[in-house]
Amino acid sequence: GTVDDIDDDFEDVLGEMSPENRTITIRLLQIFEEIIEEKQTEEAEVLKIYKQIELDNVPDAIDRVNWQGSAVDVAGQIMSTLILKHALPNANHRTSISMAQWYLESLQTGFSFPEFATADYEWKEWVDEYIVESKRILTVRRNTRAFLMLSEWGCDIVKRKDDIDIELSEYNLDLSTSEAFKYYGDIHTELCTEFVKETVKRAGYDELLGIDGVEKSDFVSYLQAEE
């Protein structure tokens, strides 16, 4: 699996996208492929993973971003919408964080993210706190009605995969499915924006907290120039 292979596999889907969305989507795929290669995934597993990619979800995620905000707000939105749309079968958080990094780097301030992972490819503790809470929010967002019922039956904690506990009393569960998607989507975006802000501070680029972001067209031009 190479980037060329990916482009061939998804040629029809990519062809239906706007030029700007196509450029961003191709970069997302390149980031994803690099992550898969870093993990030295077996070839058979790689092919299986590629077949599970829901590429047509990416433009919808991109179109939900308000490109008029501050740099950290836009980066947080990019990260959040890509995670929420879950276009990739795995590595959604790593890939979405990397895309937010590309966006902040497009401001050309010299900014680069601090290291997020340890040598054995585990999240550093401060990063893991955000990732775990993100996964909790994603799970609650999809299951408010079921979790409300469990809570009424006396259940206090739900355990999801990755051994993550969800304390039901900490979340508003009395929401319809559509209300939950909007409510927890907004909370997830706030979480991702806080993550981006902490990242910028840890990297020593506090000035990024107070500057406007770049327009979508400028971001796309940056990606094209870096190809």
Task: List each language-model region with its residue ranges.
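FIC/Doc superfamily catalytic core
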Residues: G1-E227
